[in-house]
Amino acid sequence: ENYGAKGEKDGANISYETTDGQVRFFYDHATHWVTSDEEGPIVTTAGSFQSELGCSADWDPACMRMWLQDKDADGVYTIATTKIPAGTWEFKVAVGLTWTENYGADGVPNGSNIAFTVPSNGATTTFAYDSSTHKTTVTVK
């Protein structure tokens, strides 16, 4: 198999340029999307549910299991999962795989945790982070 630009099977080659000679690449095996830290921020949701998803600990901004992606380059980073168990959970959005830049409720830098409830196991939980307002919406279906 081979995947190219925008994660498309047999898609166009992906090319990158760097200004300082160092670049980190990120690949999502599930979506086949590739990006780099030079193309835009790496955004994750760090929260109380991460250990349930296979992260080594909760509240770990470096765990890529909840990597939000902006595949269409519109500034809105999203991820959907059915793996968060039923319950009430909290999270923040972390930028750059650390807590240095993070956004809580109402897009406030270093703001309070954002709470959400998953009503049943297997429900689809979608996170959407708007990089212009720093607000995150959570939809559970």
Where are the regions a protein language model picked out?
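Extracellular/luminal beta-rich ligand-recognition
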Residues: 24-33, 48-50, 106
